[in-house]
């Protein structure tokens, strides 16, 4: 199966990216799928058009993170969106067959405008970003797209665009399927939505000492005011982190019973979480160190991967132009 997914370079990778996306990407890669993973730098401009000072830095950091987490350039194509100009051409052509009213009905359009109400998002680029997203997927004829639940609607719109193009012109595009992550979104360390603006994220490159300090300060079930007060793990962000960091069945039972009967304290629970987090993050930290030993490695990966992606995209665009009688 051909797989495609991407991330916007709007900051450092954090553990939400790891458990919500990157682990699934690696799994799909190791299952032998043909995987295309990219940095969506054009998509970053839809909400960060007014500050591009760190765009290049964040793009390279994202690729470093992909590599450190296990994306293998020998098995997957790793590329940068803006390096494949065919994405923009296909998005332009798709924009001819999608109505403005259809784009205004995309749920995330209003949600993001409301969430970022301090920014002027009344731009054409922000309105049509789902069209560019459809072009990102369809230009590689992807059959599967790993996404979170909040992106399923975008995959359905992509399927609609593929159907409409195939009906109007020629059978060029498959209809991709959403591949949902098994892990729900992690909350921030304070229990709220994980967000840089809240200061409640844990960066992947956090030091071991900082990780310990952060986890030990994490918010827990408000009902556990005293050590002797029983709690409910379902109301505790630490419990949600346990589920994401490979807690064993025996450990899970120990945490659940210990919390609900107050036979263990929150610090005991957090120490177990720390042990499991360090076990998962230690190889990633080591990979970052090895990657940084060669200052040219990341750029070489980007260059080679973008070249491979461009070759595939160019073939698709030949079919598209032929179907639309644009062969001049």
Curated annotation (Swiss-Prot):
ATP binds at residues 8-10, 16-17, 148-150, 186, 193-197. Gene3D superfamilies: HUPs (3.40.50.620), Tyrosyl-Transfer RNA Synthetase (1.10.240.10). It is found in: Cytoplasm. Keywords: Aminoacyl-tRNA synthetase, ATP-binding, Cytoplasm, Ligase, Nucleotide-binding, Protein biosynthesis. Its main location: cytoplasm. Its EC number is 6.1.1.2. The keyword Coiled coil does not apply. PROSITE patterns: AA_TRNA_LIGASE_I (PS00178). It is an enzyme of class 6 (ligase). A motif ('HIGH' region) lies at residues 9-17. Catalyzes the attachment of tryptophan to tRNA(Trp). Homodimer. Belongs to the class-I aminoacyl-tRNA synthetase family. This is Tryptophan--tRNA ligase. The gene is trpS.
